[in-house]
A protein has these predicted regions:
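Beta-alpha junction/loop-to-helix N-cap segments that form part of ligand/metal-binding clefts
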Residues: 23-27, 31, 46-51, 61, ...
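An alpha-beta-alpha
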Residues: 144-207, 211, 230, 323
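Periplasmic-binding protein-like
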Residues: 36, 95-109, 128-130, 170-175, ...
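Segments of small-molecule ligand-sensing domains
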Residues: 303-313, 324-376
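Extracellular/periplasmic bilobed ligand-binding domains
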Residues: 119-122, 186-283
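Extracytoplasmic "Venus flytrap"
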Residues: 35-56, 79-86, 108-109, 174-183, ...
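Short, low-complexity disordered leader/linker segments with a strong preference
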Residues: 1-33, 67-68, 384-385
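Extracellular/periplasmic periplasmic-binding protein-like sensory domains
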Residues: 244-317, 371-373, 377-384
Length: 385
């Protein structure tokens, strides 16, 4: 009798354990992982943090996605690419091999995106670039897409501003030669500015510096002697602010123009009064809503973070929502099916405008021009493609 009772007790215990284990296994299986591939340390950390803020807000507002009538929780697997191309490749590999994500969001910084692009392609994991504007990010990679405008358009926009608004006929370029984004955007500006002026010698000089440089006296001494009408310096926010600050200290008064990477609070924090009047292209303006979701995003961002969002933050938000939209259209969490759904995106309404992707995985979007006034980024105009 005692033996039978003991056997019965053991069986009950086994069944109880099995019964507890089943729901846990089910819960684990009802998850879809979004890899967040961003520079959270290093020279580009402020940009990566802005995009991550947008992604986290989107996750807070939309924490699940329904597939096949079942609700899946969305988890973020965050990989810091450390603002370094080698580390970017390592971070991308971790997302694929260790985190086993269904898709990837990021990165701030075109060179970082390009470093991990082949890894995502080989693993057949779709990636949605947020603010990586260099055309090479998606070129020959049918697993990389994006929600931002491209540098050929951005460079043309700023060249037109220099020619038509500044009335410039001669320009100097100061580029971050170790940065793919800076080199690429500088080239598109140069080509467009020469065409606009009709002068092959409209660019007086193309001067170089490296990421993390602090002293720009050699380049700026040359700029001062050339007396350009305008200076285009499409580099990282920190170095660009230092360049402008040191230029003003040398008595250089020519206006400075830059790209989307300037619209980060750190640009004003570093440059202070010296960057007043600096003009840049940007992705979004809080006072110029483009879709019904624009105001939803701005209000929610202010409530969560206690400040107005940047253009890079809104792209983090939109990238997350595009991923959800693609999963719903695919009705699957299989990466290949998600990729196929992203590729045929048409008229997706994000907070930063509508997204229709072309054969390269790129959208056609407007650019905003902003100017630093009173220590803030102030809207000037919107330029349509």
């Amino acid at each position: 009798m005692k033996k039978a009772l003991l056997i019965l007790t053991v069986l009950v215990a086994i069944l109880a354990i099995a019964g507890c284990a089943k729901p846990a296994a089910k819960a684990d299986s009802m998850v879809v992982k979004f890899g967040v591939f961003e520079p959270l340390t290093g020279a580009n950390a402020a940009g990566g943090a802005e995009e991550l803020d947008g992604i986290r807000l989107a996750q807070e507002l939309y924490p699940t996605v329904t597939v096949g009538g079942k609700e899946y929780k969305i988890e973020l697997a965050i990989a810091d690419n450390k603002s370094d191309k080698v580390e970017a490749a390592n971070a991308g590999q971790r997302l694929v091999d260790s985190d086993k994500v269904q898709l990837v969001l990021g990165s701030w910084g075109s060179g970082l995106s390009m470093a991990a692009g082949p890894i995502f392609k080989d693993a057949k994991i779709p990636a949605i670039g947020l603010s990586c504007t260099n055309p090479l990010v998606t070129k020959d990679n049918d697993f990389y897409f994006r929600v931002c405008f491209l540098d050929p358009f951005q460079g043309t926009v700023m060249a037109n501003y220099a020619f038509k608004e500044v009335k410039a006929k001669k320009a100097v370029i100061i580029r971050e030669v170790s940065n793919d984004y800076s080199v690429g955007l500088a080239k598109f500006f140069v080509d467009s500015f020469k065409a606009l002026t009709g002068d092959d010698k409209a660019i007086l000089a193309e001067l170089n510096y490296n990421t993390n440089d602090q002293d720009f006296s050699a380049q700026l001494t040359q700029v001062k002697s050339l007396k350009p009408d305008v200076i285009f310096a499409p580099g990282n926010y920190t170095e660009s602010a230092l360049i402008i600050k040191q230029a003003r200290e040398l008595g250089i008064t020519a206006p400075f123009l830059g790209g989307d990477t300037w619209e980060i609070a750190e640009f004003i924090n570093v440059g202070k009064q010296a960057v007043e009047g600096a003009v840049m292209s940007a992705f979004f303006d809080n006072d110029a809503p483009l879709t019904p979701l624009s105001k939803v995003f701005v209000d929610a961002y202010q409530k969560k973070y206690g400040k107005l969002p940047s253009g890079t933050a809104v792209l983090g938000f939109d990238g997350y929502l595009l991923a959800i939209d693609a999963i719903k259209r695919a009705d699957s969490i299989d990466p290949l099916k998600i990729r196929d759904a992203i590729a045929v995106t048409k008229g997706f309404a994000g907070a930063a405008g509508y997204v229709t992707l072309d054969a390269n995985g790129d959208p056609i979007k407007s650019a905003v021009i902003k100017e630093v006034k009173g220590g803030k980024f102030v809207y000037k105009t919107t330029i349509n493609p």
